[in-house]
Regions:
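Generic hydrophobic/aromatic pocket-lining and core-packing "Φ" positions
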Residues: 26, 103, 216-217
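N-terminal Rossmann-like FAD-binding beta1-loop-alpha1 element of flavoenzymes
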Residues: 13-40
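Glycine-rich loop(s) and the adjacent beta-strand/alpha-helix scaffold that form part
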Residues: 191-219
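Residue-level preference for nonpolar/small residues embedded in alpha-helices
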Residues: 21, 98, 137, 212-215
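Conserved N-terminal/central alpha/beta ligand/cofactor-binding core
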Residues: 4-5, 36-37, 42-172, 177-183, ...
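Generic start-of-chain signal for non-secretory N-termini
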Residues: 1-13, 20
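Core beta-strand elements of the Rossmann-like FAD/NAD(P) dinucleotide-binding domain
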Residues: 8-11, 181-191
Length: 219
């Protein structure tokens, strides 16, 4: 049996998670911190991990401001109506005003986009979505993260965040293990970005489990 090792790493920015959010965070961290040491840690492999691992057939939101198709105010109005007023309009507006530039960046990186041959505009499916050939979506974004981060650790499952002993209520790193070798990894960082998946089940459940019961005890 191979001896399990403990591996130590120090960095300025530690990104936990290598899905679309994590790879994007690594890219943005490099953009704003040219001289920082950036490490991204992913439990699978960033080339095909996260919710977009298999690709997408559309980008769900694109304003089309350069063609005056929609404006951020339009999207805020849509979200407000859809959610019956329970919405942070400032956050919705902030996301909407940045989405076009992000899509253009994907286009520059080589994501195949469907266009109208006459006008050059992206083809839409409904008011907000634009159509793409998205099988290569995640590998394209992962490549940008590889160029941005100093190190990418695949197959490392982060289990706990570390608290900074010198500063109260401040995270100072994370620990996890390699799912192939069993080695234990300790990451110390000045900043930790947790991009480990969507935030669901953070509320008090009210379901009584009827659906699950019907599944397991079908007639």
């Amino acid at each position: 049996m191979a001896k399990i090792k403990t591996v130590y790493e120090k960095c300025d920015v530690l990104v936990v998670g290598g899905g679309m959010a994590g790879t994007g965070a690594a890219f943005e961290a490099r953009h704003w911190g040219r001289d920082l040491k950036i490490i991204c840690v992913e439990k699978a492999n960033i080339d095909r991990s996260g919710a977009v691992a298999q690709g997408l057939y559309a980008i769900n939101c694109y304003m089309g401001m350069q063609w005056d198709e929609n404006q951020p105010e339009d999207h805020v109005r849509y979200a407000r109506n859809d959610l019956m007023g329970i919405v942070r309009e400032d956050l919705g507006y902030d996301m909407a005003r940045h989405v076009d530039s992000t899509v253009h960046m994907f286009d520059e990186w080589g994501l195949p986009m469907m266009r109208n041959e006459k006008t050059g505009r992206y083809l839409r499916e409904g008011k907000w979505q634009i159509m793409i050939h998205g099988e290569s979506y995640k590998p394209i974004v992962a490549e940008a993260a590889k160029k941005s981060a100093d190190k990418i650790y695949n197959r490392i499952m982060i289990t706990h965040l570390l608290m900074d002993e010198s500063k109260e209520n401040r995270v100072g790193g994370a620990v996890g293990f390699n799912m192939r070798t069993g080695n234990f990894h300790v990451f110390r960082a000045k900043a930790v970005i947790v991009a480990a998946g969507g935030a669901s089940h953070i509320f008090k459940p009210r379901a009584v489990g009827e659906g699950m019961g019907r599944t397991w005890y079908a007639p």
